[in-house]
UniProtKB/Swiss-Prot annotation:
Keywords: Activator, Host nucleus, Host-virus interaction, RNA-binding, Transcription, Transcription regulation. GO terms for cellular component: host cell nucleolus. Residues 55-65 have a biased composition (Basic residues). Residues 67-76 have a biased composition (Polar residues). This is Protein Tat. The gene is tat. One of its GO terms (biological process) is positive regulation of viral transcription. Disulfide bonds: none annotated. It comes from Simian immunodeficiency virus (isolate K78).
Amino acid sequence: MQPLQNRPDLGEEILSQLYRPLEACYNTCYCKKCCYHCQFCFLKKGLGICYEQSRKRRRTPKKAKANTSSASNNRLIPNRTRHCQPEKAKKETVEKAVATAPGLGR
């Protein structure tokens, strides 16, 4: 066997290994030996880095979304108008009560 320094294709071999895509490894063990046995396992298990696309939440269908929004709008509008007017009346009655109530004398 030739020494590593005298091999002419050593640099090319190292570069080809460096830029080679990582192969999938289906070993689910997290022991030290399994975490360090390949670059993929080291990144995924050892460092906890995973470049896979994360699963996104399922969205509700547009039909269901449209029905709920229209129903919520119908419910909210009457509540707003119903609560706005009595608040003004309450404030007026409180102001009148404070103005007419005799204060505590000294």
